[in-house]
C-alpha cells in the first residue's frame, strides 16, 4: 500500500496512542461493538423564557421517558402510587428522600425494596450503553459497587443472595441514602444522551440564571440561540443598548431577582435617577405586569425605572440605527420623528398623538443624546454587567455550547426563521455590501454574533458586533426575530392597534408546504425521510387547533408556551421532542404547578405523546453523526494495523494488561 507523506504523518500520530497491532485491533473491536448498539435518546426543548421550575421538572423527568421506563420495568408488580413516588424520588432525590423516609414504619425494609427497584430500573436504562460508557457515568466514590450491582452475572451464584448481601452492607454502614441518590442521578444521566435547547432561555420568567446553572451541569448539551438570548449576550458583551433592552423587559415584569439576586447587578443609581427625574410623572402606563411569583416591592418605583430605561433605550436605538444604515431601520428611530411641542409622532407618514408626552430628559434639538446623568448610569451598568462573574460564565457557556443553528443526526435545529420572499424563495439580506440568504446568512449571523463578544475590547469590530446582536433581537430581516418589527414603541405610545401589528416573515406561511421544508433541508445539505427541522420561537396556538407539525411532517415547531403568559394563548404549557432509536416522539405538556407540589404530592406534568416519525428499522449508533466519526476512526486504525504489519511503522512495546 502506498502512503502519502500527510497520511503517514497522521498514522504516526495515531500510533502514539495505539502503539501495537493488538492495541489498535482491540480498539477496532470495541468501536464495532459500540456501533451495533441502539442510538442514544436525544431530548429537545425550546423557548424556556426563564421558567426554571417547569424546565427542571421536564429535564429531570426526561419528558416522561423515565416514568415510561418505570412502568415498563415495574408496571406488573408495583402499584401505580408507588411508581409515582419512585418517579418523584428519581426526579428530586435530595428533596423527596427525607419525606419518604419519615413515612416508613420499617425503614430497613423500605431501603432494601427501593434499592432493588432502582437497580432493576438502572440495569434496564443502561442496557443500550456499553459497560465502559456506563462506568464513566458512575460517581467515583461508589462507582465500583454500583458497577457490580448493575453488571453482575448469576450463573454461579444466587441473584437474590448476591444483591441482598451487598444491600445489607450498604444499609448497615449507613450508606443507603447516598446510594439511592447516586442511582437516581445515574438513571437520569443514562436516560438521555444529549439535550438540545432550541433557543430563548432568557425572557420574563423568574430565573433564567438557574436554567443556565442546570445546563452547565448537564453532561451533553447544545443551544441554538434565540432572540432573547442574543440580547443578553450583547448586554454581557458591553452594549449599552442591549443592557437597556434587557432591563426594560426585566422591569416590565418586575423581575429583579435575576439581575440583583442572580447576577449581583445593582440598580440603585438607576432607581435614584428615576425617582428624581420622573417624580412628578404619571407612570400608570409603565406599571409592571403582575406575576405572583415575583416580589411585589414598590411598583411605582419600578414603573419609574421602567420609563427611564425605555427612554434611554429609544435614544440608544436611534444612535445604533444612525451608524448602521445596513440595518435598514430608518423610520424606527422614533425620537427623531416626534413633534415634542405638539405631542405627536410621524409614524411612517401618519401622525399619531402620543399616549405619553412626558420626556424630561430629551432635548428636542438632539433627541438621541443621553444626558450627563444617563451617560453615568449607562457606563455604570456596562461595568456592572462586565464585572458580574456569574453572568459572564453563563454567556461564555452560551457561546461555547451555542450557535445560530445546528445539524445533528440528520436534523436541522434553529430558533427563528429562514427569511423568505412572498413567493417562497430565500430572501437575500444585504450586510457590509454583500447579499446573503439561507445557510450563508445563518453562517454570517453566527460569525457577527461571536464578533460582538470576542473582538478586542473597544475595537470597531466589537462595537459593530454588539450592534448586530441588537439587530438580531429585533431587526426586520433578522432570522431570530422573524417579523417586520418589534413594536415596543407602538404599544407604549400609540393607541391605534393597527400600528402595533407585527407582521410575520413569509417563512411562517410557506412552511405549511412540504416543498419548503425540503428546500430548507437541502440548503443545509440534509435529505432523506429521517431528516427534520426542529424550530422554536413562535407559540403554537394549539387551543385554536393549530398543529406544531408543518411541511408534511418535515418541520416541527416545539414552542408551545413554556412561558406562563402564553398558556391562555396556546392552551398548553409547551412541547418537547424525543428522538430515540425508534423515531421522533412529540410530547404535549399541560401547565406545571410547582416543584413543591411535584415533590409533596407526586404530581407530574400531564403529557400526551405522538410518534411523528417511525424509523423503518431501529436506528443504531452506526447511523448517527458520532457513528460516522467512529467508522472513520476504524478505517484509520485499520490502515495503522496494515502499516504495522507491513513494517512501514514500527510497533511500540506492548503494555501489560
Model-inferred region functions:
Residues 1-657:
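Feature recognizes metal-dependent phosphohydrolase scaffolds
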Amino acid at each position: 500500500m502506498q502512503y502519502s507523506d500527510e497520511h503517514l504523518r497522521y498514522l504516526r500520530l495515531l500510533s502514539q496512542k495505539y502503539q501495537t497491532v493488538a492495541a489498535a485491533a482491540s480498539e477496532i473491536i470495541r468501536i464495532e461493538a459500540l456501533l451495533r448498539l441502539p442510538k442514544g435518546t436525544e431530548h429537545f426543548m425550546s423557548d424556556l423564557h426563564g421558567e426554571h421550575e417547569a424546565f427542571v421538572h421536564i429535564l429531570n423527568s426526561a419528558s416522561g421517558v423515565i416514568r415510561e421506563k418505570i412502568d415498563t420495568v415495574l408496571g406488573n408488580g408495583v402499584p401505580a402510587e408507588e411508581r409515582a413516588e419512585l418517579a418523584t424520588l428519581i426526579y428530586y432525590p435530595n428533596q423527596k428522600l427525607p419525606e419518604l423516609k419519615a413515612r416508613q414504619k420499617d425503614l430497613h425494609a423500605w431501603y432494601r425494596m427501593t434499592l432493588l427497584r432502582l437497580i432493576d430500573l438502572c440495569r434496564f436504562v443502561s442496557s443500550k450503553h456499553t459497560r465502559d460508557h456506563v462506568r464513566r457515568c458512575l460517581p467515583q466514590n461508589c462507582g465500583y459497587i454500583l458497577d457490580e450491582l448493575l453488571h453482575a452475572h448469576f450463573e454461579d451464584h444466587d441473584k437474590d443472595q448476591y444483591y441482598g448481601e451487598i444491600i445489607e452492607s450498604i444499609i448497615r454502614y449507613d450508606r443507603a441514602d447516598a446510594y439511592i441518590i447516586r442511582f437516581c442521578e445515574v438513571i437520569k444521566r443514562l436516560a438521555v444522551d444529549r439535550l438540545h435547547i432550541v433557543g430563548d432561555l432568557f425572557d420574563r420568567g423568574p430565573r433564567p440564571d438557574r436554567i443556565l446553572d442546570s445546563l452547565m451541569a448537564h453532561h451533553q448539551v447544545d443551544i441554538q440561540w434565540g432572540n432573547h438570548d442574543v440580547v443578553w449576550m450583547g448586554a454581557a458583551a458591553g452594549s449599552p443598548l442591549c443592557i437597556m433592552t434587557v432591563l426594560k423587559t426585566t422591569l416590565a415584569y418586575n423581575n429583579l431577582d435575576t439581575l440583583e439576586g442572580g447576577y449581583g447587578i445593582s440598580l440603585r443609581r438607576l432607581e435614584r435617577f428615576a425617582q428624581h427625574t420622573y417624580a412628578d410623572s404619571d407612570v400608570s402606563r409603565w406599571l409592571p405586569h403582575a406575576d405572583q411569583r415575583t416580589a411585589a416591592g414598590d411598583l411605582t418605583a419600578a414603573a419609574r425605572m421602567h420609563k427611564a430605561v425605555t427612554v434611554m433605550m429609544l435614544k440608544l436605538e436611534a444612535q445604533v440605527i444612525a451608524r448602521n444604515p445596513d440595518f435598514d431601520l430608518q423610520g424606527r428611530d422614533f425620537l427623531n420623528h416626534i413633534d415634542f411641542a405638539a405631542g405627536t409622532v410621524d409614524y411612517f407618514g401618519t401622525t399619531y398623538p402620543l399616549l405619553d408626552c412626558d420626556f424630561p430628559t430629551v432635548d428636542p434639538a438632539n433627541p438621541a443624546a443621553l444626558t450627563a446623568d444617563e451617560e453615568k448610569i449607562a457606563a455604570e451598568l456596562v461595568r456592572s454587567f462586565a464585572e458580574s462573574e456569574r453572568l459572564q460564565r453563563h454567556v461564555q457557556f452560551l457561546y461555547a455550547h451555542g450557535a445560530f443553528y445546528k445539524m445533528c443526526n440528520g436534523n436541522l435545529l434553529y430558533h427563528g426563521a429562514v427569511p423568505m420572499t412572498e413567493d417562497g424563495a430565500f430572501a437575500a439580506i444585504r450586510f457590509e455590501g454583500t447579499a446573503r440568504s439561507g445557510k450563508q446568512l445563518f453562517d454570517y449571523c453566527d460569525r457577527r454574533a461571536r464578533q460582538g463578544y470576542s473582538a478586542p475590547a473597544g475595537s470597531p469590530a466589537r462595537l459593530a458586533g454588539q450592534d448586530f446582536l441588537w439587530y438580531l433581537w429585533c431587526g426586520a430581516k433578522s432570522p431570530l426575530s422573524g417579523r417586520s418589527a418589534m413594536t415596543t414603541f407602538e404599544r407604549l405610545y400609540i393607541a391605534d392597534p393597527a400600528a402595533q401589528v407585527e407582521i410575520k416573515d413569509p417563512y411562517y406561511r410557506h412552511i405549511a408546504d412540504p416543498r419548503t421544508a425540503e428546500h430548507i433541508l437541502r440548503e443545509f445539505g440534509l435529505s432523506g425521510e429521517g431528516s427534520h427541522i426542529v424550530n422554536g420561537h413562535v407559540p403554537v396556538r394549539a387551543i385554536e387547533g393549530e398543529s406544531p407539525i408543518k411541511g408534511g411532517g418535515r418541520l416541527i415547531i416545539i414552542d408551545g408556551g413554556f412561558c406562563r403568559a402564553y398558556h391562555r394563548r396556546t392552551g398548553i404549557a409547551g412541547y418537547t421532542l424525543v428522538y430515540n432509536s425508534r423515531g421522533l416522539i412529540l410530547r404535549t405538556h399541560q401547565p406545571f404547578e410547582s416543584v413543591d407540589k411535584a415533590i409533596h404530592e407526586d404530581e407530574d406534568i400531564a403529557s400526551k405523546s405522538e410518534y411523528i416519525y417511525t424509523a423503518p428499522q431501529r436506528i443504531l449508533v452506526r447511523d448517527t453523526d458520532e457513528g460516522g466519526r467512529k467508522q472513520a476512526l476504524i478505517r484509520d486504525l485499520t490502515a495503522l494495523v496494515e502499516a504495522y504489519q507491513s513494517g512501514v511503522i514500527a510497533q511500540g512495546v506492548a503494555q501489560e494488561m
